[in-house]
């Protein structure tokens, strides 16, 4: 018996030492850096169609974090809706400023960042969405817009604030929240004629709704979004501008706790104007005002196919029993 107890004590001691060592390693290493990605890409041609699509995508997928509402420029600010568990997180200046922004970045370098989260300096932007499933054409449209003459993208001499990651975010960036690789081949988008497939593309590829509306940022799966814990079942904890906790909504088709009893028109009102069947939707839920009727239809069609999850969030009037 004494031998067994000694062995247990030894194993516990080794576990403590290992944990202390890991914490010390993570604290010292911080957010890791990587070799900059090298996508095979010629210069993006800025066609009128790409500039229009790029503006739509930047407004929907980038501006919420990077747009300074006072100046109208994509010069960045603190992301106050990110849980304090991750520390203080700041969106960078992505204007065309040559010193503080992306004015000297090539098209390929921007594509590498958008796809993987790794910048040309090798620094990993751990909170930045990784647009793994966005089509090559949509990515090119974003790049074209960021290098265009639009006022949002014009040089803004605001220095990007250094990140202040917590120990938790440092640990996650060294374990489960790592960068993703560049696609190994062309990435296309389904056509609007296949509403379900196109709706999935919008939700997963363009707008990444699953990131907030699945259970937890820490267990989301960028490469295989449907494998994210609690896919689209809500319960993820965010903050509003006042620092109050907001729990993401269950957007599966469960009629009791999700949006199974919503009509297509009601979904469109919620997405475009922030008005749900029971009242206004609070921040940080963005308003996708430029969604077309066909896109709303596709999103609605896809959401009908997602496995239902029974998960009541506070917005539903009752606390979840998880």
Ranges and model annotations:
Residues 1-34:
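N-terminal type II signal-anchor transmembrane helix
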Residues 21-24, 28, 157-186, 314, ...:
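Alpha-helical membrane-targeting segments
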Residues 44-45, 55, 70-107, 124-135, ...:
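Gly/Gly-Pro-rich "capping" loops immediately C-terminal to redox-active cysteine motifs
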Residues 54, 61-69, 142, 199-202, ...:
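The canonical Cys-X-X-Cys-His
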């Amino acid at each position: 018996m004494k031998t067994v107890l000694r062995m247990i004590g030894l194993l516990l001691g080794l576990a403590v030492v290992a944990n202390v060592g890991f914490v010390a390693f993570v604290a010292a290493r911080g957010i890791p850096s990587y070799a900059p990605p090298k996508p095979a890409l010629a210069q993006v041609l800025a066609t009128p169609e790409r500039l229009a699509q790029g503006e739509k995508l930047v407004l929907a997928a980038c501006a919420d974090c990077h747009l300074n509402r006072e100046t109208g420029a994509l010069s960045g600010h603190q992301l106050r809706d990110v849980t304090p568990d991750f520390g203080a997180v700041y969106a960078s200046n992505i204007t065309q400023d040559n010193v503080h922004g992306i004015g000297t970045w090539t098209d390929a370098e921007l594509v590498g960042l958008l796809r993987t989260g790794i910048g040309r300096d090798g620094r990993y932007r751990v909170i930045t969405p990784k647009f793994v499933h966005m089509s090559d054409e949509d990515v090119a449209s974003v790049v074209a817009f960021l290098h265009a003459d639009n006022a949002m993208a014009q040089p803004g001499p605001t220095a990007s604030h250094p990140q202040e990651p917590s120990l938790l975010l440092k640990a996650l960036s060294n374990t489960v929240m790592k960068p993703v690789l560049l696609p190994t081949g062309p990435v296309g988008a389904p056509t609007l004629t296949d509403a379900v497939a196109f709706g999935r593309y919008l939700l997963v590829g363009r707008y990444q709704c699953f990131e907030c509306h699945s259970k937890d940022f820490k267990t989301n799966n960028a490469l295989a979004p449907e494998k994210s814990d609690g896919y689209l079942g809500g319960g993820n904890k965010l903050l509003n501008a006042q620092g109050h906790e907001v729990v993401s909504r269950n957007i599966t088709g469960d009629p009791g706790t999700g949006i199974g009893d919503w009509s297509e028109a009601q979904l469109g009102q919620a997405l475009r104007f922030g008005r749900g069947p029971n009242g206004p939707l609070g921040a940080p839920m963005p308003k996708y005002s430029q969604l077309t009727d066909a896109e709303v239809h596709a999103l609605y069609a896809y959401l009908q196919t997602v496995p239902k999850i029974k998960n009541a969030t506070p917005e539903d009037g009752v606390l979840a029993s998880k």
